[in-house]
């Protein structure tokens, strides 16, 4: 062993007595690869592991807890220890956990013992994960102990299902064949947990449903009980699909209970869908659900219907999202049909039955239970959209029309009841999240925009409405007025002081969670980028974004990222009115800055643009060479190099800039007209000098402007232009014919000599 690490013999001396900081430091040092040497097995490593095994056999809970952590770290980072002592550690951990859980439910458990049991379960789970996948270790250390570990975990699941069920779920998926003898005990455990399902925490409920779904992996594929169907091909997901249909078949009887309260027959489409739901199918693997008791004389029992539908939805979600070793066939049509039926159960369009009494307790229970029933349809669609995605495109019209049924409406009206929206805040936010999920597959063309527009108004109202104190104010003042003078003091003594409601009403407001802002901002981003919203909704989103961005900046000192993204979207997609909030957005983000706003405020063209250059012809190359030589002439040369008929003054900087322009700018060919080509052929000197004409409007300036000479043939061959750097040319007036006393046709030739007008400078 190297001298840079502490010898294991030193740890052995302080292993039982160390605690606190010493123990944490020892754990960190044991992760060093310096201890992963096979030479240490003969002396130090064997002595150290013997001490760890002694800690795990101890009757002291704290010593067992320390042994669990040392075994976890040492086996994770030291493969030598895992291969040498993995099987022995598995046996000791199993026996320690069995002793700790044998009388776990009968005796009073202290917090210290619960922590020790939790450490034993976590260590056993980690050790099995480390051994799994290694052929020799799995065969020698893991498989022999599974037959004893599985029943022990199932028995412990009755006391601590949140600890044992995650391990059982993993064993079901990884060792389904080894688990087959214990399926009956696990099914009995899950049936007991289903009996008090609503008393479990959400995480445990999710694990219970996942474990029930994985039970279908233990059945042998291709085991067809019907001998007449034995010749058909069997699929690997046959039992998985049967379990899913077994759960779907239980929706029908529960939904039909609402048929005793609501007049479902008034909606022919809903009644037809309800009749086509899957019927009850026998499945021996699925755990049994307890009987559902509903008494209309006890209106509160109507909530049991929503609770059972929530449990069934959790079970269906497990079948959809859990990974399997084989592809699964999901019945999309049946799942969409179930969600559509659940969302259609609303008093907005379905009246109560005529023979039903209308007392406040019954109607109130019905109106509170129906939204929870609809919410399960939203959850089911959300799960399908997240895990199946674009396969739902063919069902989108039915899905969108069903989603709109969840929005509460006023009685016998089509306007939104915003007061009910406050009570259904959680469900409406889940509806918005569902819209965000399916919008990724909808695209930009949506025929019906009513749902999108309604959600914009509802989200803005939910976020802005904190708590309704107006009713408290009105009821307090009305009660005080009703009380007489003598009774007013007695009323105040009973009710207490109500002055804080009037003097500090903001102290009674509940803050909106940031998760709600995230859902709303995501929906607004999606709506602005995908669809053209009306001006009213566009202005409402803009006002909401500016107000809360400024509010968060003042209270928290920063603007959340979702609001920054919404500001960018509003600037880039201004809507139909085309008004821009760019100055306001830049002011809000002036401290942190934003790359999008920086580009909009300071646009910059890309440098060294790459274009296509065409190889010039021989005549064009000679012309370009002569022009380059002319522009590259030194500044101290006489003006004799210029034409005698025209005096052009060129500054030194102009010539230098012209040469640099020829080197850096992208050259493009200039096509000349037939007349210019003829003139250049006959009078090359005159053609070269005529391109340099002094600009009278810019005399005295140091630099001349660079322009491109265009011809009528530019449109024919635009990619093959060439660019020359020349001085700016002013329009030349039309030439006045000179009368030389000879007729114009004396020459008899077809060529016409151009007439040159001398400038005033030449005359002088």
From Swiss-Prot:
Gene Ontology terms describing biological process: pre-replicative complex assembly involved in nuclear cell cycle DNA replication; regulation of DNA-templated DNA replication initiation; ribosomal large subunit assembly; rRNA processing
GO molecular function: chromatin binding
Main location: nucleus
Gene Ontology CC terms: cytosol; nucleoplasm; nucleus; rixosome complex
Pfam families with a match to the protein in the record: RIX1
Residue segments, region Disordered: 611-648, 670-764
Subcellular location, record wording: Nucleus
Organism expressing this protein natively: Eremothecium gossypii (strain ATCC 10895 / CBS 109.51 / FGSC 9923 / NRRL Y-1056)
Superkingdom in the source lineage: Eukaryota
Comp. bias intervals (Acidic residues): 619-643, 741-764
Alphabetic keyword roster: Nucleus, Ribosome biogenesis, rRNA processing
Family indicated by similarity: Belongs to the RIX1/PELP1 family.
Function: Component of the RIX1 complex required for processing of ITS2 sequences from 35S pre-rRNA and the nucleoplasmic transit of the pre-60S ribosomal subunits. Regulates pre-60S association of the critical remodeling factor MDN1.
Regions of compositional bias (Low complexity) in chain numbering: 725-738
Protein name per Swiss-Prot or TrEMBL: Pre-rRNA-processing protein RIX1
The encoding gene: RIX1
Alphabetized InterPro entries for the sequence: ARM-type_fold (IPR016024), RIX1_N (IPR012583)
Quaternary context: Component of the RIX1 complex, composed of IPI1, RIX1/IPI2 and IPI3 in a 1:2:2 stoichiometry. The complex interacts (via RIX1) with MDN1 (via its hexameric AAA ATPase ring) and the pre-60S ribosome particles.
Biased composition (Polar residues): 670-680
């Amino acid at each position: 062993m190297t001298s840079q690490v502490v010898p294991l013999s030193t740890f052995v001396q302080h292993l039982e007595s160390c605690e606190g900081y010493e123990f944490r430091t020892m754990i960190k040092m044991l992760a060093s690869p310096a201890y992963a040497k096979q030479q240490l097995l003969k002396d130090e490593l064997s002595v150290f592991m013997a001490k760890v095994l002694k800690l795990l056999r101890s009757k002291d809970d704290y010593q067992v807890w320390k042994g669990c952590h040392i075994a976890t770290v040492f086996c994770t980072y030291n493969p030598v220890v895992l291969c040498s002592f993995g099987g022995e550690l598995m046996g000791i951990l199993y026996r320690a956990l069995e002793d700790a859980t044998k009388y776990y439910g009968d005796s009073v458990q202290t917090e210290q013992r619960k922590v020790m049991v939790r450490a034993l379960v976590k260590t056993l789970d980690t050790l099995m994960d480390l051994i799994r996948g290694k052929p020799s270790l799995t065969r020698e250390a893991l498989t022999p102990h599974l037959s004893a570990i599985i029943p022990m975990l199932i028995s412990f699941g009755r006391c601590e299902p949140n600890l044992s069920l995650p391990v059982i779920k993993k064993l079901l998926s990884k060792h389904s064949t080894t688990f087959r003898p214990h399926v009956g005990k696990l099914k009995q455990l899950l049936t007991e947990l289903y009996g008090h399902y609503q008393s479990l925490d959400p995480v445990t409920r999710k694990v219970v449903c996942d474990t029930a779904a994985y039970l279908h992996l233990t059945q042998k594929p291709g085991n067809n009980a019907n001998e007449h169907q034995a010749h058909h091909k069997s699929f690997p997901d046959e039992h998985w699909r049967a379990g899913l249909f077994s759960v779907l078949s239980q929706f029908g009887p529960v939904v039909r209970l609402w048929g005793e309260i609501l007049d479902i027959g008034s909606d022919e489409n809903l009644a037809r869908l309800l009749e086509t739901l899957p019927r009850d199918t026998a499945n021996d693997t699925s755990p049994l659900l307890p009987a559902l008791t509903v008494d209309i004389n006890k209106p509160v029992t109507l909530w049991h219907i929503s609770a059972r539908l929530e449990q069934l939805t959790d079970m269906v979600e497990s079948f959809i999202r859990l990974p399997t070793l084989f592809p699964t066939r999901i019945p999309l049509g049946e799942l969409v049909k179930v969600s559509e039926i659940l969302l259609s159960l609303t008093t907005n369009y379905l009246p109560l039955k005529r023979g039903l009494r209308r007392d406040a307790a019954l109607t109130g229970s019905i109106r509170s239970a129906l939204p929870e029933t609809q919410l399960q349809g939203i959850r089911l669609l959300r799960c399908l959209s997240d895990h199946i995605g674009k396969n739902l495109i063919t069902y989108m019209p039915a899905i969108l029309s069903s989603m709109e049924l969840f929005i509460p409406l006023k009685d016998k009206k089509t306007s939104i009841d915003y007061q009910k929206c406050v009570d259904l805040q959680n469900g409406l936010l889940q509806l918005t999240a569902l819209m965000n999920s399916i919008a990724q597959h909808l695209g930009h063309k949506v025929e019906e925009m009513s749902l999108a527009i309604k959600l914009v108004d509802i989200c803005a109202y939910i976020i802005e409405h904190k708590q309704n104190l107006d009713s408290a104010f009105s009821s307090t003042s009305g009660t005080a007025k009703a009380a007489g003078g003598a009774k007013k003091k007695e009323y105040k003594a009973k009710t207490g002081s109500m002055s804080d409601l009037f003097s500090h009403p903001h102290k009674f407001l509940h803050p909106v969670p940031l998760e709600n802002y995230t859902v709303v901002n995501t929906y607004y981003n999606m709506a602005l980028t995908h669809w053209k919203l009306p001006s009213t909704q566009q202005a409402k989103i803009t006002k909401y974004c500016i107000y809360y961005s400024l509010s968060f900046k003042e209270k928290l000192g920063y603007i959340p990222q979702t609001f920054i993204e919404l500001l960018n979207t509003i600037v880039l997609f201004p809507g139909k009115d085309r008004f821009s909030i760019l100055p306001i957005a830049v002011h809000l983000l002036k401290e942190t800055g934003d790359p999008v706003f920086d580009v909009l405020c300071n646009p910059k063209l890309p440098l060294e643009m790459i274009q296509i250059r065409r190889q010039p012809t021989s005549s064009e190359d000679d012309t370009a060479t002569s022009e380059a030589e002319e522009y590259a002439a030194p500044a101290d040369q006489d003006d004799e190099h210029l034409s005698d008929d025209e005096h052009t003054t060129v500054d030194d900087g102009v010539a230098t800039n012209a040469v640099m322009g020829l080197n850096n700018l992208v050259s493009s060919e200039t096509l000349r007209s037939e007349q210019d080509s003829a003139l250049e052929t006959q009078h090359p000197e005159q053609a070269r000098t005529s391109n340099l004409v002094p600009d009278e409007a810019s005399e005295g300036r140091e630099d001349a402007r660079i322009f491109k000479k265009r011809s009528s043939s530019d449109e024919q061959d635009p990619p093959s232009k060439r660019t020359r750097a020349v001085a700016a040319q002013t329009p030349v007036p039309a030439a006045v014919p000179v009368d030389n006393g000879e007729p114009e046709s004396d020459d008899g030739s077809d060529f016409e000599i151009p007439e040159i007008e001398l400038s005033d400078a030449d005359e002088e």
